[in-house]
Amino acid sequence: MGGQLTKLENYYAFIAKTCPAYELPGTRNCLYRIDDCFFRFWFRFVYKYMHLVEQRKFAGLIELVEKDFDSFLGTSLEHYFRTKLLEGDSYTRAANWWDRKGENEIDLVCENEFSGKVDFFEVKLDAKRYDEALLKGKVEAFLRKHPDKRRRDSRIGLLSIADM
């Protein structure tokens, strides 16, 4: 299976290997994700429910898409902000982070490698769903694993559609 994944990642640029921020090379705690937004949508909604398309049950398909579309948009919004933050001069690294148990996940860990500053962001479609105390707990879990990233000037915050 490794050869096929390598071709899809390196030759076709169809998928991307995503590892938690600051994981050591060779870690097995990585995920492969479809890198193209169109193909992510296609495989998540159209291909998965192709039987509805073939039966011309478009109303049912639309209902299923609407039910899960916010989750799809959430991952797309994370991708947008990761790209946008790296285009600016503030950060040289931006990645997701999660622990092995899956209990803690931080949407964006952004670092400026020149200054050493590390900021943590939660990405939400609906800003009302942001819980700063919950994010602080996740950041503490991150800092227990990576104590060298602890800084007084680190920022914890929210990125939402309003920040686009």
What are these regions (language model features)?
Residues 1-16:
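Short amphipathic alpha-helical interaction segments
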Residues 7, 21-164:
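A cross-kingdom feature that marks ATP-driven nucleic-acid transaction machinery
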